[in-house]
Amino acid sequence: MKIVIAPDSFKESLSAEKCCQAIKAGFSTLFPDANYICLPIADGGEGTVDAMVAATGGNIVTLEVCGPMGEKVNAFYGLTGDGKTAVIEMAAASGLMLVAPEKRNPLLASSFGTGELIRHALDNDIRHIILGIGGSATVDGGMGMAQALGVRFLDADGQALAANGGNLARVASIEMDECDPRLANCHIEVACDVDNPLVGARGAAAVFGPQKGATPEMVEELEQGLQNYARVLQQQTEINVCQMAGGGAAGGMGIAAAVFLNADIKPGIEIVLNAVNLAQAVQGAALVITGEGRIDSQTAGGKAPLGVASVAKQFNVPVIGIAGVLGDGVEVVHQYGIDAVFSILPRLAPLAEVLASGETNLFNSARNIACAIKIGQGIKN
């Protein structure tokens, strides 16, 4: 009997890999001879590197890069087991969590470090990059990332500009002649789960600026800057950058990746599941087990468990979802391929205790689910 275990992380409690181990251990008490395939997954955000490295037997590359406020930070990216794909989280180099709350300022923050990670991957002869762009501290339109790869942003006097949100309004022209030529032979996929455009009421400044420390005045300045940036990009590339879905993601990194990296912008879970080859693993399985910290009505909006379920249903394999919490509207997930859902919480407890006991609770829940399946196998109509 083949059982595929493919959970996302339980945030602040368990990594996706540890979730796999706990579920496998629980099921193994009842089904010790089953063939378990563990594929820790992620949706393109935090934890994607760890999940992809664990799922493929890859490794982590560490290096020092320029942080969002210009300081040096220790960053990382992942290499898949075959050595052919780099998995980069923008947050590792340009993340909001790298900046103390009192120092957050998207007018000054730059995505330069993310470009350094991409450049390092190219130096290692990588020709396929998965770039997760969640959790950034920046609203620089991806200027910093592009600058690290050779793009120059000039003001009206032809002087080079520092790449940050405050200089978006000063961009008069863009020189792309010295953009790293290796990008032409590198397939880059951007894991993006929002469709916000670059500018406007749903744009990078209005929606994401306040999350990164922008005051209302900063939001207005950033919006005006992005409007100017968009005009220059459109004039020079003839790409309708204002209407591109996902262009405003990560403070405009979406649009920069599309324009300067020729990247494909896709739902993160779609990229990850293709990369770990979930479809091949699911074929012939008796059961698929997925999960994450919370399963509720929002899960149907494209979260990792629904992505797993959609693949499993292509092969008519039943799916069980396990979560820390089952929230309002959880029953909707049954319409999208998750056949049964379970919470791991044995009782009400303080949050700190719940997070600390996640591994034990997940093991116990997996064992109980396995017990129920074992009982069901013996019940006859």
Curated annotation (Swiss-Prot):
Its EC number is 2.7.1.31. NCBIfam families: glycerate kinase, PRK09932.1. Its cofactor is Mg(2+); Co(2+); Mn(2+); Fe(2+). It comes from the Bacteria. This is Glycerate 3-kinase. Inhibited by EDTA, p-hydroxy-mercuribenzoate and iodoacetate but not by NaF. GO terms for molecular function: ATP binding; glycerate 2-kinase activity; glycerate kinase activity. One of its GO terms (biological process) is glyoxylate catabolic process. Divalent metal cations; Mg(2+) and Co(2+) are better than Mn(2+), Fe(2+) or Ca(2+). It comes from Escherichia coli (strain K12). Belongs to the glycerate kinase type-1 family. The keyword Transferase applies. GK1 has a half-life of 92 minutes while GK2 has a half-life of 11 minutes at 49 degrees Celsius. Pfam families: Gly_kinase. The gene is glxK. Disruption phenotype: Loss of glycerate kinase activity. It catalyses: (R)-glycerate + ATP = (2R)-3-phosphoglycerate + ADP + H(+). Induction: In glycolate-grown cells but not in glucose-grown cells (at protein level). Pathway: Organic acid metabolism; glycolate degradation; 3-phospho-D-glycerate from glycolate: step 4/4. InterPro entries: Glyc_kinase_flavodox-like_fold, Glycerate_kinase, Glycerate_kinase_RE-like, Glycerate_kinase_sf. Optimum pH is 7.0-7.6. Keywords: ATP-binding, Kinase, Nucleotide-binding, Transferase.
